[in-house]
Amino acid sequence: MDNMNHEELNDQLLVRREKLHNLREQGIDPFGKRFERTNSTTDLVSLYGEFSKEELEEKEITVSIAGRIMTKRGKGKAGFAHIQDLHGQVQIYVRKDTVGDEEYELFTTADLGDLVGIEGKVFKTNVGELSVKATGFTLLTKSLRPLPDKYHGLKDVEQRYRQRYLDLITSMESRETFVTRSKIIREMRRYLDDNGYLEVETPMMHAIAGGASARPFTTHHNALDMELYMRIAIELHLKRLIVGGLEKVYEIGRVFRNEGVSTRHNPEFTMIELYEAYADYNDIMKLTENMVAHIAKKVLGTTTIQYGDYEINLEPEWTRLHMVDAIKQHSGADFWNPMSVEEARELAKEHNVEIKDTMEVGHIINEFFEQKVEDKLIQPTFIYGHPVEISPLAKKNDEDPRFTDRFELFIVAREHANAFTELNDPIDQKERFEAQLKEREQGNDEAHMMDDDYIEALEYGMPPTGGLGIGIDRLVMLLTNAPSIRDVLLFPAMRHKQD
């Protein structure tokens, strides 16, 4: 369809509708019934690919396969086609004297994109291609629209995202990406289950938007007549479960943030959050690197991966670097000595770091990191020791309370995980929330809201706890070498299509 004008498309649609009418006139259902398959395309290759032409002729192996016609050629009394299923393609050979007049006519009038069922015998052609010689040809579904660009794939990236079903039909690479995504999540679950974690489900609609600094989507509950927020994080409900005695919990689920769309951001995305009682952020660092390495080994067979121009080594142990040391290393600015906000602003001016007038020292430190360091972190690196001002839910560091026991994981200059030793002091937590409310009053609409119910839960006593959040979409991007988050989301957010 990329290279097809409207007139050509309309002609093809009319021809296919006419074929649909003819099928019904012949008593053939163009949207057929159940078809029992014995094999997939990959089964055929793995089971019979090693046999010679002569061995296959001798064995007379009968199979039943189904899929979409992707190529078709031949005239007269015989023809070839390639049939595609989830796993790949296989060639079929159809002869009139084998399948009979009616079924051969079905084959000759079939279009690219039609879904068919084939019964037949496995053989190899003279050039050695594994194929199926049809003894039966069944039309399962008539395709009323032509496939794009003669099955070579969608050239228009926007169309790939809008019509993912066409992308999946025409791009084996795209299908493999989403199969790999499923395997990544399965291995993540398996790793945590094997390590004693309990998978739970918590609400997606919250009375208070909490657990992260982000703008929420709002909705209205008619029966209760109350405003609700689509969750921006899973965190606070999971920590309530830690209070309740569920000592190791995780949830994989959708999170919603009313923010921009980019190659790294989608308004709804998938996260895993996990919490472990009696652990701290050092334990969570070890868990993170071991889990990601495990997933890479199980799904890809290696911990050395290619992402763009970079070869990334995921084998533990990963680099650990304090945020202040990272800033000093990459910019020369030194924030170890306590300083006033005026001194921090002057330092920002000297180093051409853009800041806002309302920022405190901790915010300025974070701006230094984001503007001077982040894009240089290619190999897996744990950046720890975030300022308390930007970490309202993390525990203060015992040795230097300006900073917190928090880390973020960076790979290929992107944040992939956020974790900390959880703040379990309800008095300190209330003070942090109050400081966040002041930020909201100054115009920071991403600052945390007050959550009295969560503070009440902490007052019953939450054990020392380590917590982790990983963006699954970004992890899938990394492990599939995908340049955009849209490449790993089946149906990414899109603007309304212009007529």
From Swiss-Prot:
Cofactor binding note from Swiss-Prot or TrEMBL: Binds 3 Mg(2+) ions per subunit.
Residues annotated to bind Mg(2+) 2: E415
Keywords annotated in UniProt: Aminoacyl-tRNA synthetase, ATP-binding, Cytoplasm, Ligase, Magnesium, Metal-binding, Nucleotide-binding, Protein biosynthesis
Tree of life domain: Bacteria
Enzyme Commission number(s) of this protein: 6.1.1.6
CDD domains: LysRS_core (cd00775), LysRS_N (cd04322)
GO terms of molecular function: ATP binding; catalytic activity, acting on a protein; lysine-tRNA ligase activity; magnesium ion binding; transferase activity; tRNA binding
BP terms from Gene Ontology: lysyl-tRNA aminoacylation
Cofactor(s) this protein cannot do without: Mg(2+)
One Gene Ontology cellular component annotation held by this UniProt entry: cytosol
Catalytic activity: tRNA(Lys) + L-lysine + ATP = L-lysyl-tRNA(Lys) + AMP + diphosphate
Binding site for Mg(2+) 1: E408, E415
Localization in the cell: Cytoplasm
Similarity field: Belongs to the class-II aminoacyl-tRNA synthetase family.
Record note on quaternary structure: Homodimer.
Name of the protein in question: Lysine--tRNA ligase
